[in-house]
């Protein structure tokens, strides 16, 4: 997962990503999806989260949920959970 994400971050000019959910907690099983927050930069187009999700799905054969950090409400339960359990990539 990490290598595939790193390649796509570079391709789409994103700064980094945060893996969260079952893969970050090391609780994933065969049915688990991949949950990812992308941290864009000045050259990142936020609509590219869809491209990243699709390419990861094709590469890894897993369902993928990708969000851009700016989509999250700072201080929300979701945001706090991601920040608490997330694993930085890149």
Language model features: what each stretch is:
Residues 35-39:
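Short beta-strand->loop micro-motif that forms the acidic, two-metal-ion catalytic signature
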């Amino acid at each position: 997962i990490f290598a595939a994400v790193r390649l796509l971050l570079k391709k789409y000019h994103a700064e980094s990503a945060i893996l969260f959910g079952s893969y970050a907690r090391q609780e994933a099983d065969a049915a688990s999806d991949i949950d990812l927050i992308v941290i864009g930069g000045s050259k990142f187009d936020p609509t590219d989260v869809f491209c990243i999700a699709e390419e990861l799905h094709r590469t890894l054969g897993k369902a993928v949920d990708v969000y851009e950090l700016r989509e999250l409400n700072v201080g929300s339960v979701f945001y706090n959970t991601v920040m608490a359990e997330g694993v930085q990539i890149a």
